[in-house]
């Protein structure tokens, strides 16, 4: 299998990165061993005379011009605005082919430009090599002068958090929540299995806003700007900075700086709690002792009587069985254990969620018996 080289941007930064982030050093070595090509200059990311150039592709992703991005979004009209994030805004757009897409416009203050550029490079480098039904597809990108855009497949039902406690009026049912959890677990399993690029990938920013839903509520993981390739033959990566989102941080990672695949499992467990309770991972509108979801429910997940009190009140009682709820809560409780070695693997999560779906469906409470097959 052919694996493309990491961007020249990494080479320009490697003299600094090696001192602060051993993973970046190992990452470069691994890819250099796969390739004998030399690094191209960073300017190769930009498109010279874009208006007159034919469509180019990088690793299977289309390259677009700034003009095409403006035309696709009606000059970034507020009517096409889908949402805002830490590194810019996301717009709905329509390409010349008629395809509806989501376009992330990277828009950063000067002091954050280096971080934004890094995330842009990582996302294009990694996501354009991945292919799985539970990962959002990168259609293309634009690197025109100082402008940076990422073009994704359009996900009609937005992100998971909006359906649980956000702007979406219709709340998703328990069987659909189980299916979403299973789909997300399969996406993580693909990343962790090393089948995509030869070595495992840690997402590092798994959360409910990064679980997108298509028209049939199939889950797809998005936003790979903080993703890390694990060092070859290693299960731990020491990083200089702890990156991610508050509320989803692996406690072991924050205290030691050691990033592992199990860091994603902790975040996955937090999302399971969101699916179960309908609450946010962190809710700053609540009192100081009620803001953090994990701290609120950790000690009652294995108490069947108390567990009933935290089940999302939006869930119809006839949509779930307490047996399935109990199994689901038990899985979540093991995912959020303090010590990473005590957490289940992502494949264990996949298998248990398949069993939970089957258990819930036995009582005729929605859903179908899942097909047990290899990912």
Swiss-Prot record:
Gene name linked to the record: PBL28
Q: Which GO terms describe its molecular function?
A: ATP binding; protein serine kinase activity; protein serine/threonine kinase activity; transcription cis-regulatory region binding
Binding site residues for ATP = 82-90, 104
Q: Which residues are recorded as modified (Phosphothreonine)?
A: 65, 245
Active site positions, chain numbering: 205 (proton acceptor)
Keyword terms: ATP-binding, Cell membrane, Kinase, Membrane, Nucleotide-binding, Phosphoprotein, Plant defense, Serine/threonine-protein kinase, Transferase
What range(s) does the Protein kinase domain occupy?
Answer: 76-356
EC main class here is transferase
Q: What is this protein called?
A: Probable serine/threonine-protein kinase PBL28
Show the GO cellular component annotation of the record: plasma membrane
Sites where Phosphotyrosine occurs are at 152, 253
Q: Which CDD domains match?
A: STKc_IRAK
**Which reaction(s) does the protein catalyse, per the Swiss-Prot or TrEMBL entry?**
L-seryl-[protein] + ATP = O-phospho-L-seryl-[protein] + ADP + H(+); L-threonyl-[protein] + ATP = O-phospho-L-threonyl-[protein] + ADP + H(+)
- SUPFAM superfamilies with a match to the protein in the record: Protein kinase-like (PK-like) (SSF56112)
Can you tell me which family this protein belongs to? Answer: Belongs to the protein kinase superfamily. Ser/Thr protein kinase family.
- Looking at the record's lineage, which domain of life comes first? Eukaryota
For this protein, the record's InterPro entries field holds: Kinase-like_dom_sf, Prot_kinase_dom, Protein_kinase_ATP_BS, Ser/Thr_kinase_AS
Look up the coiled coil feature and give its residue ranges.
none
EC assignment: 2.7.11.1
| Compartments (UniProt record) | Cell membrane
- The protein's role, per its UniProt record: May be involved in plant defense signaling.
Could you state one GO biological process linked to this protein?
Answer: defense response
């Amino acid at each position: 299998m052919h694996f493309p080289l990491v961007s020249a941007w990494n080479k320009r930064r490697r003299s600094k990165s090696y001192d602060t982030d051993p993973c970046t050093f190992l990452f470069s070595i691994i890819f250099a061993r796969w390739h004998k090509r030399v690094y191209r200059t960073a300017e190769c990311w930009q498109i010279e005379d874009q208006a007159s150039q034919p469509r180019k592709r990088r690793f299977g992703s289309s390259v677009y011009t700034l003009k095409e991005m403006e035309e696709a979004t009606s000059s970034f009209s507020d009517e096409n605005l889908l949402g805002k994030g830490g590194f810019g805004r996301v717009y709905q757009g329509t390409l010349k082919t008629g395809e509806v897409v989501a376009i992330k416009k990277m828009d950063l203050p000067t002091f954050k430009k280096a971080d934004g550029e890094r995330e842009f490079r990582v996302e294009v480098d990694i996501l354009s090599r991945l292919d799985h039904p539970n990962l959002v597809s990168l259609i293309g990108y634009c690197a025109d002068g100082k402008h940076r855009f990422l073009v994704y497949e359009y996900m009609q039902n937005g992100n998971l958090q909006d359906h649980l406690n956000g702007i979406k009026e219709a709340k998703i049912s328990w069987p659909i929540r189980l299916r979403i959890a299973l789909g997300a677990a399969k996406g993580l399993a693909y990343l962790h299995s090393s089948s995509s690029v030869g070595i495992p990938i840690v997402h590092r920013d798994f959360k409910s806003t990064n679980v997108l839903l298509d028209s049939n509520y199939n889950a797809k993981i998005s936003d790979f700007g903080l993703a890390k390739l694990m060092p070859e033959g290693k299960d731990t990566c020491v990083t200089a900075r702890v990156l991610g989102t508050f509320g989803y941080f692996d406690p072991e990672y924050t205290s030691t700086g050691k990033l592992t695949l199990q860091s994603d499992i902790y975040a996955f467990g937090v999302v399971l709690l969101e699916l179960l309770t309908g609450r946010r991972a962190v809710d700053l509108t609540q009192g100081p002792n009620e803001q953090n979801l994990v701290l609120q429910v950790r000690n009652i997940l294995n108490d069947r009587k108390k567990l009933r009190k935290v089940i999302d009140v939006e869930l119809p009682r006839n949509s779930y069985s307490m047996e399935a709820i109990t199994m689901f809560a038990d899985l979540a409780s093991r995912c959020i254990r303090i010590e990473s070695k005590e957490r289940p693997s992502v494949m264990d999560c996949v298998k248990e969620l398949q069993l939970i779906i089957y258990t819930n469906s036995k009582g005729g409470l929605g859903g179908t018996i899942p097909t047990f097959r290899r990912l």
